[in-house]
């Protein structure tokens, strides 16, 4: 027993001697940390604190609002898209979203994602015949690796851009022959078999048209649904001028140089939780809104016998009320020890009231302007301020908020008071350049705070 007792005595002495040293080191370390944080706050802008130090700590440093956008930040230099394709997507963004990036409510489309892909490889062939207007087939390969498993294809379009220097004196009719080439390998012969599909389309374009759109949904939808991310297609164009309007035109001569290699546009529905689901909001906007408050307001006006009984009871209550008022008037108006200003303070809202505050920033401050094309500025807004003791209906707070206030004041001050937090949000439309050079239009849910509450 002597050996264990000596060991315990030695251990306690050692701990007693070391405790002040460790405490002092912790205190000095804490002072240094406070000084460093004060220096950081005084010399740095708020958004410099959002810059991740390490890629592993990015999700922990950035607030949830920017986690979605920070995924595309950094990494290898991005490929720059074609200027014509970028111009088309900018026009699409202006059609679907406001200047502040809020999706327009008058748009009833079901897709929340639009991706534009340019061909990664192209097999050039001999120029087209200027006399017959026939353009030889061109082989194109599109890489669709940016499509995620939660994105479902709704519509696909081939986009041809027209050279601005070309002017049309008459309408031009074109026929497009498209063939999808899908290589497959047999387990026995290991030879590649070529599966082809032919798609014909007739369309016209005139003086004001700068783009030609060809719907190829029926061909690409089964391929994209089967998670095929490499699309090899062969396209042939035959374009001729309208002979009825210009019979003197020699063999319908048409300048084929106005057609540049096409881009592929996919209209997708992102089913993830972070995406904005327009159909969901449209469904709830069209529903008849009659909540429990309306039901209570309807039942507050009795009819028939209930109304007569309520009238008699209100008459008795009125007489009792008069007696109460007369007795109250006989009392002194204000007691000697009563402070009128303190009495009215409980009915006033705090000066620093819970409300929305603006926080306007540009993506250039975050060094994200090299891949976020639109919007240029962003105002996420935030909620800040004190919650009143008696939370009114304008905050839309539940009864639990008032109960929590009572617990804090009367029972246990360790229970936190209700906090000022966002209650409603609006979505945000973002146009970005992907690492592979493709362009993506996406609508994100819950990106701009629009209402505050106390909870």
UniProtKB/Swiss-Prot annotation:
Intrachain S-S bonds: 354-420, 383-452, 387-454
Note: Ovarian physiology and fertility are controlled by endocrine and paracrine signals. These act in a species-dependent manner and determine the ovulation quota in different mammalian species. While humans, and mammals such as the cow or red deer, normally ovulate only one egg per cycle, other mammals such as mouse and pig can ovulate in excess of ten per cycle. The mechanisms that regulate the species-specific differences in the number of follicles that go onto ovulate during each reproductive cycle are poorly understood.
Region (Disordered): 305-328
Keyword Transit peptide: no
Stated role: Required for ovarian folliculogenesis.
Proregion span(s): 25-320
Description of how the protein assembles with itself and partners: Homodimer or heterodimer (Potential). But, in contrast to other members of this family, cannot be disulfide-linked.
Source organism phylogeny: Eukaryota, Metazoa, Chordata, Craniata, Vertebrata
Identification of the protein by name: Growth/differentiation factor 9
Subcellular location: Secreted
Transmembrane regions: none
Any matching Pfam family: TGF_beta
Organism: Papio anubis (Olive baboon)
SMART domains: TGFB
